[in-house]
Amino acid sequence: SLVCQIAKLKGHKVIASAGGAEKARFLKDEIGVDAVIDYKATGDDAAALTAALAEAAPDGIDVYFDNVGGGHLEAALNAARPYARFAICGMISMYNAEAPVPGPSNMALIIGKNLRLEGFIVSTHWDMRGDFLKELGAWHSQGKLKWRQTVLEGIASAPDAFIGLFTGANMGKMLVKLA
């Protein structure tokens, strides 16, 4: 949700993807995104996501921040406007796969639409950390940032907390309270 909040604070139209009605409500009602695709309701295959994204962004998308990969990435490639930019930060759709997951079937769109896909790791941009923290701190002080967290009790719950990250069991950050 932080990426969504930063984009909204910078004046952009934001379409978010969430797994479940509660998460979708949080993004829409509390974060203020313009549209939410609840992939647990629509289905998370590329065709269903492409249809949902076309409805939410009929003119296409210019920027895409990807934590999921798979059908989500394929749908975003379909919706991309020429010269769109993609920041690829994660591929959670593949983390639990028992066999290799095929990539999007529409990778040729990267060429045809002149898209720019780039891996995104925070440490690559460490030189911008000070400015980012200053801006983020100001938003926090002004009460402009919202968050949720899921807290499990005791070290014995750490494995469940970790697994829950990959199954969507958390709302916001997953924390384990030790004492």
Residue ranges and their predicted role:
Residues 17, 39, 87-89, 120, ...:
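Generic beta-sheet signal
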Residues 4:
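N-terminal Rossmann NAD(P)H-binding glycine-rich loop of SDR-like oxidoreductase domains
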Residues 103, 151-154:
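A structural signal for short, well-ordered beta-strand elements
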Residues 144-151, 159-179:
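C-terminal capping/lid region of NAD(P)-dependent oxidoreductase domains
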Residues 27, 71-145, 179:
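Glycine-rich phosphate-binding loop and adjacent beta-alpha segment
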Residues 34-37, 118, 147-151:
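Structural signal for short hydrophobic segments within the conserved structured cores
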Residues 1:
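Residues forming the Rossmann-fold NAD(P)(H) cofactor-binding site
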Residues 8-75, 123:
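Adenosine-nucleotide cofactor-binding segment
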